[in-house]
Amino acid sequence: MENKKENFSEWYNEIVTISDLSDKRYPIKGMNVWRPYGWKIMKLIDNIIRNAVDKHSFDEVNFPVLISRGMLEVEFEHIRGFENEIYWVTKGGKEKLEEELALRPTSESAMYPMFSLWVRSHADLPLKIYQIVSVYRYETKHTRSFIRIREIHFFEAHTAHESYEDAEKQMDEYRIIWTEIADALCLPFLYDQRPEWDKFPGAMYTIAFDTVMPSGRSLQIGTIHQYGTNFSKNYDIKYLKEDGTFEYVHQTTFGMSERLLAAIIGIHGDDKGLILPPAIAPIQVVIVPIPGEGVERYAKDIETTLNGIGIRCHVDNRDNYTPGYKYNDWEMRGVPLRIEVGERELKEKTVTLAARNIRGKKTVQREKLVYEVPDMLDLVKEKITEDAKKTFNSLVVSASSLDDFKKEGLIKAFWCGSKECSDKIENETEKSALGFNLNNDETGKCIVCGKAGKLAIFSRSY
C-alpha cells in the first residue's frame, strides 16, 4: 500500500479500491459503482443523518429525478449557477420531447412547485422535509471517488417558515444537527460563511462546514443556506396569516453528500487501511478463531452474545486463510475491534481484544465481554477523534503575511471581504477564500490592503 504521508492521492485511490468501497471502472466517467462494503458504510452514515434530523421534526420524502426546463427556469439565478452542469433528457424513446427534462442537480426546482400547493396557511408551517437521493452534475474537472463525481449520493433538507427570524432559528438548528453528525463520524471542521460570489445560487448567504485532508487541501463536507423569500416569490409559496393577509414563506436548506465518506477515509485512515468510527462500521467486532477443537463453537457463541446486545459482530471462519492474513485483512477494512480466540482462551474462558487504532492487546473474561466490548469501542472512537483533531490543528495555520500562505492547510488571516484582495491572494498563493470563520469573531487589518477585516479561512480546495 502507498504511504499516506508521502503520496496521499495515490494512497486514497488505492484504499478505496482494495477496501471494496467503490469501483471506478464503470464505462461512464465520474459514475462509480458502490461495492457492497462501501454501500453498507454509506447506509450507516445515512442512518446517523436520519436519526439526527428526525428528532428535530423533519419528515423524509422522495421526489422524482426529472425536472422540466420550465420548472428550472422559474428561478433564473438558480439555474444560471448550474446551467453548465445539467444533464438534459431530450428524447423519450425515439420521439423528441416537447420540453427538455433535467436530471436533478439539486431539488429546489422540483420541490418548490409542490410547496406552493402544500402551504396554504400559517397552520402548515413550519414545513420541514428531507430526502437522500442521487443528484447529477456534469463535472468537467478531474473526478475522484466520493470527492468529485457526476452521480452524487446526496442529503438535502428543505424548510419553509413564517418569518425570517424563524428561518434564522432553523439555521441555528442545522448547526446543532451537524455537530451531532460530525461527532458520530469523528470529523473536525470549521464554520465558514462563503463570500458573496461563492454562495449557493439563489441564497441570501451560505455557511459551509469545511475540514482539511492530510494533503492540506480543504474539503467542503456540508452546507446550509438562508434563502429568505428569494425562491418563494418565484414559486409563489405563500401562506394566509392570522390577520387574513398573505405572506411569502422564508426558506432554508441543508446539504451533505458522500464527501462525508471521503473525509472519513482520508482523515482517519493509515498505512494499514481504513479506520472506521464504530457507528459506521458494518462489522464493529470481528472474531478470528485460531484453529483448535471446540474453538469455532466458542467463537459463534461469543458472536451470538454480542449481536444480542446490538453489536455488529462477525466470525471469520474462512478455511483457506491464516489468522495472520485475516488480521491484516480486517485491519485494512477498518474494523474497530478484533477478538482472537484459540484453545487457550477456550480453556481459560477468556478472549483477547485488539483495537484497530490502539496498540497492544487485552485479555478479558468471557463473562465480562458485554461490558468490555462497548467500553473498548468507546475508547476506539475517542482515539479516532483525538487523532483527527491533532492532525486538523496541525493543518490550521495563522498567517501574518502572504509568505505564510505557502504552507499547506487552512490558512487563517484577516480579510476585508473584497474580491480584489481575495483575487490578489489567490493569484500569488493559489489559495482561495473559503469565507469568514464563524468559529472566531476576531477583527484586525486585512492582510492585503490593511483595511478593517475579520478572520477568514483560505485554502486550496478539492
From Swiss-Prot:
One of its GO terms (biological process) is prolyl-tRNA aminoacylation. It is an enzyme of class 6 (ligase). GO terms for molecular function: ATP binding; proline-tRNA ligase activity. Its EC number is 6.1.1.15. It catalyses: tRNA(Pro) + L-proline + ATP = L-prolyl-tRNA(Pro) + AMP + diphosphate. One of its GO terms (cellular component) is aminoacyl-tRNA synthetase multienzyme complex. The keyword Amino-acid biosynthesis does not apply. It is found in: Cytoplasm. It comes from the Archaea. Keywords: Aminoacyl-tRNA synthetase, ATP-binding, Cytoplasm, Ligase, Nucleotide-binding, Protein biosynthesis. Catalyzes the attachment of proline to tRNA(Pro) in a two-step reaction: proline is first activated by ATP to form Pro-AMP and then transferred to the acceptor end of tRNA(Pro). Homodimer. PANTHER family: BIFUNCTIONAL GLUTAMATE_PROLINE--TRNA LIGASE, PROLYL-TRNA SYNTHETASE. Belongs to the class-II aminoacyl-tRNA synthetase family. ProS type 3 subfamily. Consists of three domains: the N-terminal catalytic domain, the anticodon-binding domain and the C-terminal extension. NCBIfam families: proS_fam_I. This is Proline--tRNA ligase. It comes from Thermoplasma volcanium (strain ATCC 51530 / DSM 4299 / JCM 9571 / NBRC 15438 / GSS1).
